[in-house]
Amino acid sequence: TNGLSSDRGFTTPDVREADIKNFAMRRCAKKFVLCDSSKFNKISKATFAAGSDITVITDKITENIKGYNIKEAAQL
């Protein structure tokens, strides 16, 4: 992902890429997104997923990650 925000969810600058990611997300029983902490509070052009049913795997869990309405966060 290129961005994660509380307003827009997971975003990417490429609309076609967002369509493919959205298509894949709709077909997954469990959803995981790799997102380093530099992408928090960033917004790109196209949203491909909301956070409510996604587990985020990240390098650093920050205090404000709870505001993103994600299912769970895991730190590597």
What spans do the regions from the language model cover?
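Conserved phosphate- and dinucleotide-binding cores of soluble alpha/beta proteins
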Residues: 1-76
